[in-house]
């Protein structure tokens, strides 16, 4: 059986925590930041845990995560 391939686009966007959860970056933090409050920008800087419904698809894209 051939080796499973990793989706490289997904590999750049997701990481696994020590407990096995998958984390991602939040959106809305790349540009047009002038009108956003400091509090909102700080919240967007934090990592978010991938929803359990989406986690199944992410794990299929990253077989060696």
From Swiss-Prot:
InterPro entries: Ribosomal_bL35, Ribosomal_bL35-like, Ribosomal_bL35_CS, Ribosomal_bL35_sf
Keywords associated with the record: Ribonucleoprotein, Ribosomal protein
Gene Ontology, cellular component aspect: cytosolic large ribosomal subunit
Pfam families per the UniProt record, alphabetical: Ribosomal_L35p
Keyword Lipid biosynthesis attributed: no
PROSITE patterns in UniProt: RIBOSOMAL_L35
Family label: Belongs to the bacterial ribosomal protein bL35 family.
Protein name, entry field: Large ribosomal subunit protein bL35
Organism of origin: Nostoc sp. (strain PCC 7120 / SAG 25.82 / UTEX 2576)
């Amino acid at each position: 059986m051939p080796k499973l391939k990793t989706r490289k686009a997904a590999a750049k966007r997701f990481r696994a925590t020590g407990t096995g959860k998958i984390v991602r970056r939040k959106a809305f933090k790349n540009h047009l930041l002038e009108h956003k409050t400091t509090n909102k920008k700080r919240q967007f800087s934090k990592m978010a845990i991938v929803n359990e419904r989406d986690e199944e698809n992410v794990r299929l894209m990253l077989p060696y995560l």
